[in-house]
């Protein structure tokens, strides 16, 4: 079973968000939440929320399908950050000049899944 959560237009640069996402990719969901809770990076808060949302989506899918749900079984099978739209702003500088400031945004995607049990032979 797979469940996905996407947060779009998050106001953090994709490079900084990728540093945080790389910490939790492949980990168990509960362990990932613990790592994100104490990570010092500012991008850890939106990633934490996306992981929580993916876990909740998995719970809803399990209830809908009538499957037993255990949060401890979930692992983060996919986690990636795509670049969102860039807001361009201008900073006034001396002698009538203006410097461009690029305020970057990110799209954060997290997929949680239950590992497939090996069939008995």
UniProtKB/Swiss-Prot annotation:
One of its GO terms (cellular component) is cytosolic large ribosomal subunit. PROSITE patterns: RIBOSOMAL_L22. GO terms for molecular function: rRNA binding; structural constituent of ribosome. The keyword Metal-binding does not apply. Keywords: Ribonucleoprotein, Ribosomal protein, RNA-binding, rRNA-binding. Pfam families: Ribosomal_L22 (PF00237). GO terms for biological process: translation. SUPFAM superfamilies: Ribosomal protein L22. It comes from the Bacteria. PANTHER family: CHLOROPLAST 50S RIBOSOMAL PROTEIN L22-RELATED, LARGE RIBOSOMAL SUBUNIT PROTEIN UL22M. Part of the 50S ribosomal subunit. This protein binds specifically to 23S rRNA; its binding is stimulated by other ribosomal proteins, e.g. L4, L17, and L20. It is important during the early stages of 50S assembly. It makes multiple contacts with different domains of the 23S rRNA in the assembled 50S subunit and ribosome. Belongs to the universal ribosomal protein uL22 family. This is Large ribosomal subunit protein uL22. It comes from Arthrobacter sp. (strain FB24).
């Amino acid at each position: 079973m797979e469940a996905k959560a996407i947060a779009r237009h998050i106001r953090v640069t994709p490079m900084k968000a990728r540093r945080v996402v790389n910490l939790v990719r492949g980990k168990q969901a509960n362990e990932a939440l613990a790592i994100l809770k104490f990570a010092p990076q500012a991008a850890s808060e939106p990633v934490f929320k996306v992981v929580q949302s993916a876990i909740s989506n998995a719970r809803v899918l399990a209830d809908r399908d009538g499957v037993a749900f255990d949060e401890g079984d979930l692992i983060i099978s996919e986690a990636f950050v795509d670049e969102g739209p860039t807001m361009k702003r201008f900073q006034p500088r001396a002698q009538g000049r203006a410097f461009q400031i690029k305020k970057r945004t990110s799209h954060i995607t997290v997929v949680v899944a239950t590992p497939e049990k090996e069939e008995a032979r």
